[in-house]
Amino acid sequence: MALTVDVVGPAPWGFRISGGRDFHTPIMVTKVTERGKAEAADLRPGDIIVSINGESAKDMLHAEAQSKIRQSPSPLRLQLDRPQAASPGQANGESSLEVLATRFQSSRRTHTDSQASLSPRPCSPFFTLPPTSPQAPTGEVVTSHSFQSLAYSLEPASADHLYYGGRRGSRQASLSPAGDSAVLVLPPPPSPGARSSSSRLSVVSEGESHLLREDSEVFKMLQENREARMAPRQSSSFRLLQEALEAEERGGTPAYLPSSLSPQSSLPTSRALASPPKLHTCEKCNTSIANQAVRIQEGRYRHPGCYTCADCGLNLKMRGHFWVGDELYCEKHARQRYSAPPTLNSQA
């Protein structure tokens, strides 16, 4: 929509522009100051400036357009091209509620399909058929390598006592076309109420859960094997007490028992007591340095108060020292004792 706006001055006019021939975009109003002159003239962000005071702005550079606007006399006449505003009935480019509802339903279907793609497929090892499915009737034999060890371990007499949640399982067997061994297939699990009322014990074999009666031979055999594999556990304190009692019964020397059975108290005294840290000795006063020490050379240390010039007694901590023979001097007195100053050896 083309319109003309007269902004009453003087400058500043209260708006900003962007674009230009150097940016390959038309000159556009990007910001209008609140309660400013441009806002009073109904200038809005997004308006495209076609001409400035009658001069076409199509081929103007950005800096050129800025200069013409700033130097323009009052009033500033701008010919604008204002884009049409979206109607209130439009939302996200759609003009009706029916189209929006259709898009919402399609998005829900897409979300459902994505969740369904994550569910196990019939060829997946995690796929299980429902109890009422005609593809897996009760008592059907399924050949699986994970059940073969359990199928070989069950004898005909003990397999009759196999229960699943308190219900006797079917004992049908057959061979698959691939030649796998037949295994026992159980009926689907009962309701939670029936499962809680039945007395059973869960036994894990090859990663699959089965239920056996407590008076069956298979349960007793598995229980004996489990108890045989379990190693006896004994606490360290009880073991020490047992060794002490056995040594006393044999008439030997009683074993050493720590008072609080703590590992620290059982250590020898020579190891428990740490040796005191080695202290440096000040070479000037020949006393031990307990706190801070100043290292002059390898194996030579002094107190901070003893680190002074041998002539004037000036502290050399922030100045550094100079060697003259075997004494430390400040720079002033070291130069007085040297005939050749370039041979000074300064150590900070």
UniProtKB/Swiss-Prot annotation:
Segments forming domain PDZ:
1-84
Q: Which GO terms describe its cellular component?
A: adherens junction; filamentous actin; stress fiber; Z disc
Sites bearing Phosphothreonine, chain numbering: T128, T132
User: What is a single molecular function from GO for this protein?
Assistant: actin binding
Q: What is an example of a Pfam family matching this protein?
A: PDZ
- PROSITE patterns, A to Z: LIM_DOMAIN_1, LIM_DOMAIN_2, PDZ
Q: Which domain of life is it from?
A: Eukaryota
Region annotated Disordered, chain positions = 67-139, 165-202, 249-275
UniProt feature, compositional bias: Low complexity? 193-202, 257-270
Biased composition, Polar residues: where in the chain?
Answer: 103-118
Q: Does the keyword Magnesium apply?
A: no
Family matches, as SMART domains: LIM (SM00132), PDZ (SM00228)
Name the GO terms of the biological process aspect.
Answer: actin cytoskeleton organization; heart development; muscle structure development; protein catabolic process
- What is the predominant subcellular site recorded for this chain? cytoplasm
| Chain's role | Probable adapter protein located at the actin cytoskeleton that promotes cell attachment. Necessary for the migratory capacity of epithelial cells. Overexpression enhances cell adhesion to collagen and fibronectin and suppresses anchorage independent growth. May contribute to tumor cell migratory capacity.
Q: Which PANTHER family match?
A: PDZ AND LIM DOMAIN PROTEIN 2, PDZ AND LIM DOMAIN PROTEIN ZASP
Supply the name of the protein: PDZ and LIM domain protein 2
Species for this entry: Bos taurus
The lineage, from the top, is: Eukaryota, Metazoa, Chordata, Craniata, Vertebrata
